[in-house]
């Protein structure tokens, strides 16, 4: 088992979710392999680390893979990529057969519904001869619909450091904003990871009741190559939870209004 829940997310975000889950009565064990599974009549027994349990159901959520078998790809002249599992496509979703396009879980990068949808738009436009732009795979939003929600785009703090960036971080609690109190968002935070020299937003991470809605303005800012400096001067409506994004940008330089 992995060392933290939500292993693809920033460490600070995962800590918030773990804390909230524990308050909800959920037991969390990380870094402990599930072993000695025994399926009985109406229950499942297993061990994890130095503990054991008997439960009604055991769900193994180890991810999913593309189902490309039986599609007749070879006969159609459609090749798989280096993994031998996913369909090889170019930036416009075109396969090695110029008349065939592929999108979504069958091709590269993350298996996300919103990614597949946008790839479908690109494929149709390209096939129809219209001008189009490839999907920016670096700006794909991760959206986890737990309670609280988790949303992220770009690099985590650890990834940015590993990539050699000198960084600054801005964090703001949603509860610090008036709307955070109104909507009873006591645990949520917005975290920005930015390049120290130029202000580029390298990663944006949110946990909160409406995180998956709040992330959109950060994706737009990053796509338009705006820095945290520009974001910190954009007037946000009051009182809204979106003000947390504004204060997170200001927190990078230590002047969040509602810190």
PLM regions and their residue ranges:
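FAD-site-proximal beta/loop scaffold in flavoenzymes
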Residues: 52-129, 134
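Flexible, glycine-rich terminal cap/loop adjacent to redox cofactors
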Residues: 128-129, 145-259
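Rossmann-like dinucleotide-binding cores of NAD(P)H-dependent redox enzymes
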Residues: 1-45, 49, 109-117, 125-159
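Glycine/Thr-rich phosphate-binding loops of Rossmann-like dinucleotide-binding domains
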Residues: 6, 54-55, 67-70, 110, ...
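Conserved beta-strand segments of alpha/beta enzyme cores
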Residues: 27, 79, 166-168
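Short beta-strand micro-motifs enriched in acidic
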Residues: 39-40, 81, 193-197
């Amino acid at each position: 088992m992995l060392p933290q829940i939500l292993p693809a997310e920033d460490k600070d975000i995962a800590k918030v979710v773990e804390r909230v889950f524990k308050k909800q009565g959920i037991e969390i064990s990380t870094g402990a392999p599930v072993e000695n599974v025994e399926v009985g009549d109406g229950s499942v027994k297993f061990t994890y680390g130095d503990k054991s349990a008997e439960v009604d159901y055991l769900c193994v959520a180890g991810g999913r893979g593309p189902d490309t078998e039986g599609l007749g790809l070879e006969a159609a002249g459609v090749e798989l990529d280096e993994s031998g599992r996913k369909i090889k496509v170019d930036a416009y979703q075109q396969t090695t057969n110029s008349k065939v396009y592929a999108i979504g879980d069958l091709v590269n990068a993350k298996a996300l519904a919103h990614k597949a949808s946008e790839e479908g738009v690109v494929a149709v436009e390209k096939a129809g001869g219209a001008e189009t732009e490839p999907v920016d795979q670096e700006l794909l939003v991760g959206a986890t619909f737990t309670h609280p929600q988790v949303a992220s785009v770009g690099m985590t703090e650890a990834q940015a450091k590993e990539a050699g960036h000198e960084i600054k971080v801005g964090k703001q609690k949603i509860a610090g904003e008036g709307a955070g109190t109104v909507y009873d968002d006591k645990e949520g935070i917005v975290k920005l990871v930015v390049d120290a020299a130029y202000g580029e937003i390298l990663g944006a991470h949110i946990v909160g009741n409406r995180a998956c809605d709040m992330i959109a303005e950060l994706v737009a800012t990053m796509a338009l190559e705006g820095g945290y400096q520009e974001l910190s001067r954009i007037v946000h409506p009051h009182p809204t939870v979106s003000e947390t994004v504004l204060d997170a940008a200001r927190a990078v330089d230590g002047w969040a209004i509602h810190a």
